């Protein structure tokens, strides 16, 4: 229920708080941990925005992505100690807040670790440190990612935090544990439904682009595992021979001021162009032919275990956009091979690109462009292309509408979760006193 006894905190991100709550600077509640790890007894951990601070092996199991590997000459004795119940300021805290650790281990020296110096409910602060309003406050300490300024513990230490009595912290944390768990379970079920729809869409595409639409035509063995048998009148062709352009974008000179808009792989990794993440460069559009993005281009992510292989079809786009060097721009002669059909073929091969097509380094993995250009794909007559493309478009459109509806539900649930976290960690709402009360 709404708390009627509120006072103005005089802090913009916090707003009003209960009249019996205190405001205390972070440095009086938390202490920076400076000890270094004993690498023979502890495990290497990774801060993640979704799972908190977890072992690297668990991260790979949960996400299917490889964590950033340490360089071979890294002195592991210089790694920072972190213990269960500690908090971590990561290089991405400006985006996702501070991460909570449920494990003992070591983390990179680039991270800052801190722990409570007073008796507090750690879960209460775990929620506070992931609150969007608090994260917006953290952003004021970074100015801009392009400035390369990480969040310092000293900046956090001078930030006023809401500090209710311990029993109130306990009530809020317990209440949020239950509510957030309920929302997360709903979200998990909906996400599984989306995954099932995506798998169904993929199966339709795979069958259409490898077997065609007529089940009665004579077939032949392609000799390629992911294709299997294909129609006799189809052929295999290297990607480079059916494209008119297959090049990476530019290495932009990023600027804070508005300049030439740059499309990075992060912008389309979720299946759509997210212009909220747009960056700008001082690079003139007209002088960078190689990096220009045009309508009916295929954009292909070339870097990173979690993004590599993600693909996007540019239906229409205004003139003036450049792609960054982590994006491969693929262009075809539509009279020979449909660019959208090639996009559909690429869209079913994410795991293939993320595995076989990746060449490793100590810190990052990249698409092997030579292997990619020489990869064989099925090429069918133009009449078959048109029929297959029409068939996939119709089927995919219906499935995509269902997925969009479910994604909107996920967005609503996430916004609802964020709102109740903010309302309770800042005291604007009181924890219901009756068991089973609903807000």
Label every PLM stretch briefly.
Residues 7-10, 27-42, 47-84, 237-252, ...:
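Sequence-specific dsDNA recognition surfaces
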Residues 1-22, 164-217, 378-439:
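Amphipathic alpha-helical coiled-coil/heptad-repeat segments
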Residues 51-66, 87-112, 123-127, 136-141, ...:
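Short, ligand-facing micro-motifs at secondary-structure edges
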Residues 39-49, 59-62, 140-142, 218-222, ...:
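Short coil/turn segments at secondary-structure boundaries
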Residues 12-16, 70-71, 112-117, 157-163, ...:
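Short, well-ordered beta-strand elements within core beta-sheets of diverse protein domains
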